[in-house]
Amino acid sequence: MDITQLLAFSVKNKASDLHLSAGLPPMIRVHGDVRRINVEALDHKTVHSMVYDIMSDSQRKTYEEFLEVDFSFEIGGLARFRVNAFNQHRGAAAVFRTIPSKILTLEELNCPKIFGDLALKPRGLVLVTGPTGSGKSTTLAAMVNYLNETEYGHILTVEDPIEFVHESKKCLVNQREVGPMTLSFAAALKSALREDPDAILVGEMRDLETIRLAMTAAETGHLVFGTLHTSSAAKTIDRIIDVFPAEEKEMVRAMLSESLQAVISQTLCKLKDGTGRVAAHEIMLGTSAIRNLIREAKVAQMYSSIQTGNSLGMQTLDQNLTDLVRRNIISPAEARSKAKIPENFPG
């Protein structure tokens, strides 16, 4: 099988990822589980050529210099893929993350109504967080798409690499990829403030300068969407503040308390019927109570504020898991494996 056939097989079987690893057969991740494809093991030369042949010259140069590379790749009529090529003890390896050609809507993802409201905010910071593979990009793409279909404006994205491709609908959409189109997230964000955007998507807030620039953009009247790999709203606030030196922390708390619109922390749960996965969300909104807790460095009290803020659209992860179990969408065992307080889900 060549790489196109393997990727077509992967997409047909609704796999989120295709794994190639020298010395082993190809494997796919379906509904969270990694399974072998029933073909012979691939040797180093085969894996290397499969991956090397789809790289551009600059990607090959990066791969040869740094021994690993990230890039995106598209097969027309099938899907786009986010690729990481690397080396391991048996030889070459790569992971292809499937990025569906069709951007799912907020309704198709069963997202709460508040997600649409957040996508139309005139300014502020909206963060979607969670571990790798938790569907952050899918959720953000749906929110950006909702804005694109609803308002007239300019949406600017900075990604590494570009994942979902947005057509300009009501909005003008400009997507920039770190590497071929800009040198870094920080460089693109500096320029962004002079590019007349209404909304900016920052693919990953991975360092101090990027976080600082994203917060500045939100504070100066732009809607900024960003992602972090944190597992809860409280940990997200801690992570942002911890990045800054001690003498800046108070100022950062003040900035964050003014600009934060929401933190959505999500995880994927297996459906009870085994046919797929569904996202469970913790939702913290920038209410006056939450803003005060950020300003006063009382992060530990956020959980109870979220817990009692259901009427405003807030919810803890465990509250959402309880609802998914009650509606027979996920099993109590699955909820227990994802819960902050597992003992709330006996059985």
Predicted regions and their residues:
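Short, flexible helix-loop junctions that flank or precede catalytic/ligand sites
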Residues: 1-347
